[in-house]
Amino acid sequence: MDKATELQNAYQAYWDALGTQEAPRQEEFNEAYKGVYSSFEEFVNDNSLIDELTAGWPEEAKTYFDRDAYIRDLQLDYLVAEGEEEAYGVRYSVVYVFDEN
């Protein structure tokens, strides 16, 4: 999938997720769009969000950290829209991630 197609699909997913009649401004979309991922967990891992949070923690404390619960709760801070992409004739599920600000 090329970048232009990804952005078109992401823009449509953003508009659908907002649930508005009026199309979002391009600047608004550009600021909000964080990327397309196979899952929200992949977004968290690719952006080192947990590593940043736990930096400086003792290793023992990290063993008690509930990654799954944190990822589930963190998803509430983002607008996550499910979609499908296609590459080489194969369709697969993706998530588009947007800031909710």
What are these regions (language model features)?
Residues 1-101:
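Acidic interaction surfaces
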